[in-house]
Amino acid sequence: MQTCLRAARRIRHLVPFVAWLLAGTPALAADCTPRDLPPYDAAGKGGWAHVPLSKLKRDTKYAPAKEDGRSILKATAEDAASAFVHLEPSDPAKRPFLEWSWRVPALVEKADNRDPKKEDSPARLIVGFDGDKTTLTDAEQRRLSLAKKASGRDAPFATLMYIWSNRDPVGTVIPSAHSERLKMIVVESGAGGVGAWRNYRRNLAEDYRLAFGAAPGPMLGVAVMTDTDNTNAKAEGHYGPVRLACPAPAGK
């Protein structure tokens, strides 16, 4: 029984920040058109929403701001973890590219994403995907069932988490210690880019295949998260606008 309760608590930590979960299969656009996600100050207006992870954890503080004429989000975590989430149904086969930027003033000194006791990051961008959960292992289905009972929400079929790592090389895929259906991909490593805005363009379909060995199902939503609840440290993360983009036209 204690083992089941510990498993429920571990997976419950992952469920709330994927509050993008939808009933049934999301409606998808027939053709590819770029999609700029709403500005961060659209929270509560069909835009972004703050999602706590647990009543036992402090919340990361998220504050929309303006910098260089654009909408950004400033996240401040002090022994804290929570997320800023936006529901966004999309088909990675038709609109495969995810573009965003972020800036961190400093790394989380003791963070190590391979160690569940030190698994923090100054910047994360998280993407949830739908899929057929009956194909998952019995153990994973039990974890998801426990998570639903604990949180009142379904968990996504799979989750990609783009992170800034202290030491793992860019391109490294790190399995989560909490769930086989969550994989972290390192897109920035070390202190070389600290203090500067860093820009990213990731192919969701390719990254999903790299992490899970299959084509992705529909995208359910996106979240950003700065967390320090495991290292009890303080960190900041500044997030620029998020965009879903199309492949370049043939010949360009």
Locations of the language-model features?
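Bacterial N-terminal signal peptides
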Residues: 12-25
